[in-house]
A protein has these predicted regions:
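Structured beta-strand/loop patches that form or line metal/cofactor-binding pockets in enzymes
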Residues: 41-71
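Rossmann-like adenosine-cofactor binding region
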Residues: 264-362, 367
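Glycine/serine-rich phosphate-binding loop and adjoining beta1-alpha1 elements at the start
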Residues: 96, 115-229
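Glycine-rich phosphate/diphosphate-binding loop of Rossmann-like nucleotide-binding domains
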Residues: 193-196, 201-310
């Protein structure tokens, strides 16, 4: 059995009932075979793959809080500090009922490579809770966030671990979390990113993941002799990533025609009305079914099916494993030329392989959605310097970071004879930097 197969088997055995984590490890290690085989003796001796797939620290804790009826509720909190070889742990917090240790480990593992790809000095981590913010009052969300931070504060710090937002954690939640951290610690430091502009946040942070996704898509298409302008795009999701991906798509001359939420999806052949979408999701916090009140000629469909829409480009921006094999077949049949992941691992392994085998250009989330964490790191820099950069400065830095990420992964793929395979390129480019740092720092 090869070293890669041994480590994959160990991960599955030691981490039962964590399919998302198994999937993430398998996808990364399979694509690293060519590098591992060239360095197998050294990697085995130093147990590099075992150390890479085992988090440095896994924290689980109880989160008690009181709802508006006076009833005590209890949720579980998580923080997985996966790898700090190249910098302090950095990664978001996710509040969603599906959250468990396996999902947080998969997200933290992916974050290690994503953060490495940015070229910035940040390690990988992830956290969250099975708390569901949907349907909760502001007071209940504040109570939960304060209780969550009352334990989490012990494990984080501006030079140790800097969380950010993710699904279910936006500006409101970051504000409540930051307020409680400051109250407990009595220090004003950049311990969270995604903060409000009045208390240390960065301009362009909210837009960064969606904008970065489109900068990556444009650069990848350009490398392949294709113009983004004039293309039609399927976008899934209706949160932060999707909304600002749609906004930047319009700015770059493309036409996004869909959006989705947990109940259904919209198809607007004239192009999604961005202002209507923002009002529904950011102001009203309502369901997408409201959209047809703004645009009577648009279609609303309950359930799934967005990948059946005919378009040139697909941008999955909702959640893990949303794009499955049958969806990939529909995309190929409809002539899609590129898929770029705005969410974390939204495409299953089988779907990814099918897309690649059928000549679809494919950029994985760890590269395509790295704009969010890159701009979080820029927020950390501004906090450290006690400065605030303009929107244009941050956006220009973000654009250059995304261009650099693409060319780094493109070069890595070509170096190992895998030209055009951006999954392999992203994993190799992220892996090499982390492994070099781990080796230099010894067995720790």
């Amino acid at each position: 059995m090869s070293y890669v197969d041994e480590v994959i088997a160990q991960v599955v055995e030691k981490n039962p009932v964590q399919p998302e984590f198994h999937q993430a490890v398998k996808e990364v290690l399979e694509s690293l075979r060519v590098v591992v085989e060239a360095n197998e003796e050294e990697f085995r001796k130093n147990a590099l793959l075992e150390r890479l797939t085992n988090p440095e620290r896994q924290i689980m804790f109880r989160v008690p809080w009181v709802d508006d009826k006076g009833q005590v509720q209890v949720n579980t909190g998580f923080r997985v500090q996966f790898n700090s070889a190249i910098g302090p742990y950095k990664g978001g917090l996710r509040f969603h009922p599906s959250v468990n240790l396996g999902i947080i480990k998969f997200l933290g593992f992916e974050q290690v490579f994503k953060n490495s790809l940015t070229g910035l000095p940040i390690g990988g981590g992830k956290g969250g809770s099975d708390f569901d913010p949907k349907g909760k009052s502001d007071r209940e969300i504040m109570a939960f966030c304060q209780s969550f931070m009352t334990e989490l504060y012990r494990h984080i710090g501006a030079d140790t671990d800097v969380p950010a937002g993710d699904i279910g954690v936006g500006g409101r939640e970051i504000g409540y979390l930051y307020g409680q951290y400051k109250r407990i610690r009595g220090v004003y430091e950049g311990v969270l990113t995604g903060k409000g502009l009045t208390y240390g946040g960065s301009l362009a942070r909210k837009e960064a993941t969606g904008y970065g996704l489109l900068y990556m898509t444009r650069e990848m298409l350009k490398e392949n002799g294709i113009e983004l302008a004039g293309k039609t795009a399927i976008v899934s999701g209706a949160g932060n990533v999707a909304i600002y991906a749609i906004e930047k798509a319009y700015q770059l001359g493309a036409k996004p025609v869909t959006a989705t939420d947990s109940t259904g999806w919209i198809y607007d052949p004239e192009g999604v009305d961005l202002e209507a979408l923002k009002e529904i999701k950011e102001v009203k916090r309502a369901r997408l079914s409201e959209y047809t009140k703004y645009r009577p000629n648009a279609e609303y469909h309950e359930g799934k099916g967005v990948w059946s829409v005919k378009a040139d480009i697909a941008l999955p921006c909702a959640t893990q494993n949303e794009l499955q094999l049958e969806d990939a077949k529909a995309l190929v049949a409809n002539g899609v030329i590129a898929v770029c992941e705005g969410a974390n691992m939204p495409t299953t392994l089988e779907a990814t392989q099918y897309l690649q085998e059928n000549g679809v250009l494919f950029v994985p989330g760890k590269a395509a959605n790295a704009g969010g964490v890159a701009t979080s790191a820029l927020e950390m820099s501004q906090n450290s310097e006690r400065l605030s950069w303009t929107f244009e400065e941050v956006d220009a830095k973000l654009q250059q970071i995304m261009i650099n990420i693409f060319h780094n992964l493109d070069d890595a793929a070509k170096k190992y004879g895998k030209a055009g395979n951006y999954v392999v390129g992203a994993n190799i480019a992220g892996f090499e930097k982390v492994v070099d740092a781990m080796t230099a720092q010894g067995i720790v």
